[in-house]
Structures are given as C-alpha cells and as structure tokens.
Amino acid sequence: MIELKNISLSYANSHGDSQLCHIDLTVKKGELIILAGKSGCGKTTLTRVLNGLCPQFYPGTLTGSYLLAGKDALKMPIHQLGTMVGSVFQDPRSQFFTTNTTDEIALGMENIPLERAVMQKRIELVCAQMNIERLLNRRIFPLSSGEKQLIAIASICAMEPKAVSYTHLRAHETLRHL
C-alpha cells in the first residue's frame, strides 16, 4: 500500500541539512503504525511527504521512491494524492474551511465531487462509526479541541482515502472514537 525507499528530504531554507535521511518504510493495507520520537525528529515532515505537501507546498529537495497503491506518488498531481492520503493535523483549526461541523465533513467530498445523496450517507455512516452524531450541525469553533479533531478525522474518513495520517492525536479521548 505505502512503500518508501531511501526517502531523503532537505527543505529549501535548511542550507543543505537533511530533515529526513534514507527512510525506508512499508505500510500494508489495514496496518496502523505510530511514529514516535522527540520534537524535531521528522515525524511531521514524513507526514508531509506522504500527503504530498513536501515538496509541493513546503519546498525542498526530495529523493528516493514513494509508491502508493503501486503508483508513483511522487509523480501524482497534488489533488490526486490528496484524495488518496488524508491528513489530520495537530491543530485541526488549520484545516477547517467552514463554520458548521456537517458542512466541514461534506466539504472534501464536494471537491471530489460526489453526489449529495452519497455524501449524506457517508456522513451518517462515518459519524455513526465514530459515535459522534451529537457533533453534527454544530458551530465548529465553540467545540473542544478533541471534538474539533474528531470533526477533522470524520471529514477525512468520509472521503474514503486509501491511507490516513494523523499528527499528534489527542490520546485516549480521540482514539476511542476511531
């Protein structure tokens, strides 16, 4: 499913210092992996490589190979990679584009685009699976940080990507909904 071979990355402003050096990683369908390490060790950078933000939005030099579902992910347009790898960031507010929870969950599917009836079924299914129906049709910004993260996760899961990367999940509260 995900296969990284000899991935190295140096950000454009890093004066040649590598943020990732010769990373090999294979993640099979259905596997869950956890990247753990000290602050600054490259966990977020690796996530940015997986979802295509590096080097497209965070300029730098990326070498090695990255296969996603057997396809060369480094040659995919960012919009295609974005539908295959969903990302939930440390601060979910940074990825919200609406002020309503249901609208936010639907937004990514609107961009695919999917028919309204399909989107509604996916919203209902994902929210039921995560046991977060109580969060539908609410204003986003008064929600707790954990609830915001759950809405971000639901919005990604509703798009049915092949892989999802999470940066800094809020421990047990968020994990029990997955």
Specify the residue positions occupied by each region the protein language model found.
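Hydrophobic anchor residue at the start of the ABC signature
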Residues: 153
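Conserved ABC ATPase "signature" region
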Residues: 117-135
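The feature captures the beta-strand-to-loop junction immediately N-terminal to the Walker
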Residues: 36-38
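A short, flexible loop at the N-terminus of ABC-type nucleotide-binding domains that lies
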Residues: 1-4, 9-22, 54-59, 75-77, ...
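Conserved ABC ATPase signature
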Residues: 139-143, 147
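Conserved small/polar residues in nucleotide/adenosyl-binding loops
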Residues: 167-174
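ABC ATPase NBD Q-loop/coupling interface
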Residues: 65-80
